[in-house]
Amino acid sequence: MITDYTNIIYDHFSKRVTRATYQLDKEQNYLMRLATPLSHYPYKNNNLMIIYFKNGAGELQWKDKRVKVDREKFIVTNPSIGWEYVNPKSRPIDVLCIVICEALRKQFHYFESTSTMQQLDNPFGQVNIDSFFLEEPLGAAHYKSGKLLQRIHQFSNESAFHLTDPEELSMNVLTSIYQDQYHGYALAKRVQAKKPSTQLETFKRLLIAYEYIHDNINNPISLEELARVSLLSKFHLYDSFKNVYGQTPHQYINRLKVAKAKEYIQQGENSIGEVADLFGFNDIFVFSKLFKKIYGNPPSYYQN
């Protein structure tokens, strides 16, 4: 049983092991693990693909756009005429990759778009709906679907992984990503703009600010900093963030800091003062007041 994927490509569906890339069959599903140097890989006429980068980096190139990917990120690519992964320095990548064939994708869309009665009357129906997934790299730690990919990747290093059913794993991931991104589209509609395309582009930039906050929560984060990384003006960022998330960036940052601080306090390894300092609260009185405002109890209530 394979638990070390160094310099190989393993497909959980076929149990195939190779040392070189190969063209994927349009009619097949794949759940692949690879930990190998890879300079490039062209995927022409591609199926829906979900890629989680545990380690490594590179760039996905379509005809009309390019997207950089990095460690602990995942991305969903919609069916299209194809794209190419490029890694000029051929640095090793550690990747979990799930490919959903057209038939399974249509079955999934049928399940999501029809009533229970319709599914009982026609249990094997299919619906051909254009995939709507955001083709943007997302931090795995910040989304339920990303955390699921992390768990599957971790489990794939254990011998018991080979007892799992790859189709069920793929269906689980597809459902989770659909729920996350459906929720994302609902949030995008809160952006004050007339055109859906403008709402979506603004939301994509807000996601950059959102992930930046989560990745740097132990550091001071200014509105100017968020505006710079998201390529939104301060006013546009402030207004759109408030409409989408129901609070200003500053309020969101403080709530997240306090939530993380609560976790540290419950672990019992640091004093309340040390935890407050860790998250940038220099005045323990201010920290305790904000903490009680959010949770209704002082920090000491959560000490073991």
Predicted ranges, named:
Residues 126-196, 201-204, 208:
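An amphipathic alpha-helical interaction segment
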Residues 179-184, 190-200, 208, 212-258, ...:
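Basic/polar phosphate-binding segments, predominantly the helix-turn-helix DNA-binding elements
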Residues 108, 173-181, 241, 265:
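Hydrophobic recognition helices of helix-based DNA-binding modules
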Residues 2, 18-127, 154-164:
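N-terminal regulatory/effector-sensing and dimerization cores
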Residues 1-11:
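N-terminal presequences and immediately downstream first alpha-helices
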Residues 156-159, 177, 213, 253, ...:
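Hydrophobic residues in alpha-helical segments
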